[in-house]
Amino acid sequence: MKNTKKITLACQVCLAKNYSTNKSVTNRLEIKKFCKHCNMQTLHKEEK
């Protein structure tokens, strides 16, 4: 797994860091995922 880095996805509503994943692209990752703290699907953005 060369050229990949581990990132954390944080909820944009409550700022909880819920998910971690690997990525190999250079732009910032934004995904709609379920947040257990907000109890709904929200936008999660990449944290460093």
UniProtKB/Swiss-Prot annotation:
* Gene3D superfamilies to which the protein is assigned, alphabetical: Ribosomal protein L33 (2.20.28.120)
What GO cellular component term, any one, is given? cytoplasm
InterPro entries reported for this sequence: Ribosomal_bL33, Ribosomal_bL33_sf, Ribosomal_zn-bd
Q: What Pfam families does the annotation carry?
A: Ribosomal_L33
This protein's UniProt keywords: Ribonucleoprotein, Ribosomal protein
Question: What GO molecular-function term can you cite, just one?
Answer: structural constituent of ribosome
Listed SUPFAM superfamilies: Zn-binding ribosomal proteins
Protein name as annotated: Large ribosomal subunit protein bL33A
Species per Swiss-Prot/TrEMBL record: Metamycoplasma arthritidis (strain 158L3-1)
Xref: HAMAP family? Ribosomal_bL33
Please indicate which superkingdom the organism of origin belongs to.
Bacteria
Q: Which family does it belong to?
A: Belongs to the bacterial ribosomal protein bL33 family.
Q: Which GO terms describe its biological process?
A: translation
